């Protein structure tokens, strides 16, 4: 049996730490909106994140060879500029917990895009999960009482999830055509490309003047060192030492912990209707995760 198939306490601990790091990053992302524009922060986050990732790449002796440009740029635009940039923009007027949940609808978009572009058939359980998620989204959005600001935030958060899902399809095609591509190298180069793109966006789009408070520096340090370099290193370690089905639990745990952290630290009470929608989305995520696990077990040789 491979190491990834065994119960590894150290890897499970790494998964817990990883989940907490990525969950708490939503709190910093929300708090920093009071001092810096969404695109300025995303650009700086990508710049420092790329710097730290390339240092990690050098320390691990992986070399600096660029990954396939076309796919890497597409992932940078969709995953980092699209997912992170849109989520940060959504947080300007939206709550951290709500934005986290809507961004983490990504697995549903992956299922839909895989059916449309990769020819993967939707199973009955996936149809059911998508219906549950759609109803959950309806309850979270509460369109009967939305104003423009909350509607804008919700749509940006959903588009963040859509963009993230599209990046997963691009990544699948990349791995199909270049199976030996190194994940850490890919992450580093796409972060560099995203830093360049977001820097241009930040220069072109008018935003609030940056108020260089300690929160901004703490948020940048947290994003670059913990949420990027350490978290991705932990993710690689977790993937190597745990089954993919267990590693994918972070897809469920991060938005849930994000909601709990925002409730506890930011006083964001979702209310009965929105809370019910969040529960339904998490249930649907669990169903999609279970179906993925079954599909992987069938396809393994």
From Swiss-Prot:
Query: Per the UniProt entry, what is one GO biological process?
Result: sulfur amino acid transport
Q: Which GO terms describe its cellular component?
A: membrane; plasma membrane
Gene deletion effect: Deletion increases the sensitivity to cystine.
Q: Which residues lie on this side of the membrane: Periplasmic?
A: 30-38, 93-98, 149-150, 207-218, 267-268
Per UniProt, what is the membrane topology? Multi-pass membrane protein
Primary location group: membrane
Keyword Repeat listed: yes
- State what this protein does: Involved in response to cystine. Overexpression confers tolerance to excess cystine.
Spell out the protein name for this chain. Answer: Probable cystine transporter YijE
- What lineage does the source organism belong to? Bacteria, Pseudomonadati, Pseudomonadota, Gammaproteobacteria, Enterobacterales
